[in-house]
């Protein structure tokens, strides 16, 4: 019988079978059956192989914590206190103001889930290495494909950990003793080496528009390698624009498989997006099977929004996040260079419409804004539940206590009104109402009740070809070729305008730091990457935006390690700038 040293979680969490590779306890030994006696069928092998991918699916496509770490605290999204809703101990206000502490749950999850992912992948790989694939009748190359994909999955989790926290404890087996944190450079090199090996064994997509299933192919690994080089300045203080550009050009040229920009943006996120030629890697989702909406639906939309879609079932909403406002309470535009997300979309951009499901899996618009009365079925309305209870909600690109103006419930001690006009209203992360902020319904759109069987059919894109175009564009810009950068960005932008007539294309003359950041934002809004882009441009801690003053503390470019993680593995060191007195 084989014995395996199953290491407990660094955060003390949990599940004995998770095989986490960071802990501060003596190894515990469990008796386990050998692969030869347990993995006696192809089904059993596939189940073992799939376990780390189910964790990846949760981490990347369903759990809200990774999304919140990447989007809240940036100039893109807010999770404001809405009256009595969403204060939650002030945690979301802390994220907004970069007041990070080592006891925040989302930060704990960011570390824990990435470490768990690497452990699960190595554990599965070790088991499958001992399986006789030929004896079980697998097609030639199946073993190599599975093992290489699991190694690539390890790279993904370490890349996320490096991005959020810096150097990580590095493991190549679940049988290892607990490790301290490696340096940033060591972690970077380790990820790079894993991806270099993976690229030699991963399958290359042969058919344009072939169905994506969540498996890792060569283009996904190549893009991860490009992402690593693209952010090398942030990770290891070394510029690698030329190296990143070379990989991006190879991906676009088809070296790693057949992909193409999708001319219809709704195909990328829509109800049959597994066949979009732009998708390189995505989290699968399907009605009544592996369902996920990436938390985008429930957290993004207002209360009762399901009624705007004909009372579509299984569509409760939390009325949480919204875009940073573009307008102050009086309607005057803010002037900060960053933020103001909705207002920066050109009015002729076909995405800048209220979301309307048209039927048969078709829809228009990416936003939830204005009076929420369905234009195709006017009796379908979204009514308020808090300040605007019983009224049709009007989502505004502002944040303020509008219902408190000259309201008898809000008076000072001398009997005068607390707010005599909208000009008196504060606009902060702590002073929102239920209709504050434009919402984005981009990832995992919903049908109406009539087409309820399409619900959850959209996959959650993780990597798409447009990102490769934008990485190459920024690399060209950084290397002095602004005209080449503009051409690449405009190649993507044209699909958002009728007949490709872009009224404000990128040019060599108008492309600067802020235009580049705006282009990243408009193309990838809500796709859990904004923090990384701001850090790469040295803007995350140095720029102001709505209700946020720059800290100018570069330590905050990384999150602290949760105190429970440090207690569980005392070989780990806290990131600079954090700690307890």
Residue ranges with predicted function:
Residues 21-25, 29, 78, 86-88, ...:
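Long, intrinsically disordered, low-complexity segments
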